[in-house]
Amino acid sequence: MPTWWGRKSCKNKDDNHRGIISTDRDIKSSAVVVDPPLTPTRGGTPRCSREFAGASSAFSGFDSDSTEKKGHPLPRPLLSPVSIHHQDHVSGSTSGSTSVSSVSSSGSADDQSQLVASRGRGDVKFNVAAAPRSPERVSPKAATITTRPTSPRHQRLSGVVSLESSTGRNDDGRSSSECHPLPRPPTSPTSPSAVHGSRIGGGYETSPSGFSTWKKGKFLGSGTFGQVYLGFNSEKGKMCAIKEVKVISDDQTSKECLKQLNQEINLLNQLCHPNIVQYYGSELSEETLSVYLEYVSGGSIHKLLKDYGSFTEPVIQNYTRQILAGLAYLHGRNTVHRDIKGANILVDPNGEIKLADFGMAKHVTAFSTMLSFKGSPYWMAPEVVMSQNGYTHAVDIWSLGCTILEMATSKPPWSQFEGVAAIFKIGNSKDTPEIPDHLSNDAKNFIRLCLQRNPTVRPTASQLLEHPFLRNTTRVASTSLPKDFPPRSYDGNFSLQPTREPYPGRLSHDNYAKQPLSRTIKSPSRENVRAITSLPVSPCSSPLRQLGPAYKSCFLSPPHPSYAFPGQDSGYNLAEFAASPFRMKKDAMMEPSSFRTQTPNSPLRSRLV
């Protein structure tokens, strides 16, 4: 047995007793950081011990012929290829400094095995198997010094405090006891998650197991780009319109459709207006790109004109006002639709207008103009056809004027010419489309303002909303009475002058059978919430009890004070009705039988019969 066997055993026990902290500090100091020479003030530290003398001073471990102070160098750390790669980038030509921890010929195998066992219990940073790196960026400190594990830590190591920080936390502020999440596997181009997804907010989102909540229904028609189907949401029960485009990689037409549809998605995702169709989401599959939009069951203006003929002027006024409201919103966001026409304007059952088909729409900045030739030829503005100096929001105003002519005549302007001839007529001639004679002067003036060839003198959408043609119009879905208009007797036409009756709801007894109730009483405006509430009705005015002429001279009961109309006195004046010039007659159904025995003690009601 060698003479130093006992002393070495004591060293090994002492080394095991020091545990994790001393070995970890030596590994870090020997592998990466070169400690400065020992000073007398550090004499009491573990690095002054004889076991660590070889690794305490700079490059002292290279001297294999050193005497009694020569320590046993630690073995080379079991670095993964990734960590070695990072070390090579940092150390460069100084990688020889790591030979301090290399196996020396002066150390025995037992010492090495014990040191490896001690280091395996205490070190976490270097004893890591090679794992795929996540695509996240690595901080310079993490890349140059250590490679953090990407797999969860063992429970026995969860209580070990990091020695790099005095607070026991990592560089990112998290505690060292937290588990590190596993890296996500790289997504292949053919994986289902890369193909099946839904797009909401500008990016395609993966739906769970490729299952879509929207179910495709019947075919509705073909649009500019693809087909349109009816859709149903299986979770919310909401209807939608599904616009589909075939995804064909080697087809130029399919690529153009996808490009335009993606442009429409990006634009509609940023818009929110009652006169613009609402965007719900989109989904990309292996064969199609589906866009889910608000379903407007009434169809387009073009379809209504085809089915029912040209519109009357009140309908044109109502639709034009709503179209301008949507255009004013778009132009306020520096967006040009570029394809305003009847086929791209939808109408719901209540007469509400929705602008649709934004595949041609374009966002315009203050330093750019549009030069591309896009839109339908019959509705194109002259500056679009000429494409000389570019064009701006005024092109939508010209198209609006053409759409008004379309609604008034059931055909687009310049329809007597073919497509190329119409384009030539718009671009080179000084003529304007013919305006029908049956329209009012305000309507004609409105159309002439929209169809001015000089785009700089065309009014804006906000200015056109103040035109007399639209200023005094109201929605078709609502009554023509203002919100604060109280109920009055109806004399055949609507008048804003109040009647002279003390109680507006009171009717004369001579014309009740010939004259209906006021429209405001029978069907109040939906905008007046208080008028929707049912009013109390006296039995004499009930429609179930009109058996004789006695009940044709009655009046409505006064409203309850809480249901009074604006500007109407809710008081109930009995003296007013006592002065009525007529008498209420008897009712055989309400009065008791005249054959009842009459006695002095009979009730007063029986004695009066």
From Swiss-Prot:
GO terms for molecular function: ATP binding; MAP kinase kinase kinase activity; protein serine kinase activity. ATP binds at residues 220-228, 243. Residues 1-202, 487-511, 590-609 are annotated as: Disordered. Expressed in flower buds, roots, leaves, seedlings, stems and immature siliques. Absent of mature pollen. Its EC number is 2.7.11.25. Pfam families: Pkinase. Residues 594-609 have a biased composition (Polar residues). It comes from the Eukaryota. The keyword Glycoprotein does not apply. GO terms for biological process: pattern recognition receptor signaling pathway; regulation of defense response to bacterium; regulation of defense response to fungus. SMART domains: S_TKc. It is an enzyme of class 2 (transferase). Residues 214-470 form the Protein kinase domain. InterPro entries: Kinase-like_dom_sf, MAP_kinase_kinase_kinase, Prot_kinase_dom, Protein_kinase_ATP_BS. The active site is at residue 339. Residues 40-64, 90-108 have a biased composition (Low complexity). Keywords: ATP-binding, Kinase, Nucleotide-binding, Transferase. The keyword Manganese does not apply. It catalyses: L-seryl-[protein] + ATP = O-phospho-L-seryl-[protein] + ADP + H(+); L-threonyl-[protein] + ATP = O-phospho-L-threonyl-[protein] + ADP + H(+). Belongs to the protein kinase superfamily. STE Ser/Thr protein kinase family. MAP kinase kinase kinase subfamily. Interacts with PBL27. This is Mitogen-activated protein kinase kinase kinase 3. It comes from Arabidopsis thaliana.
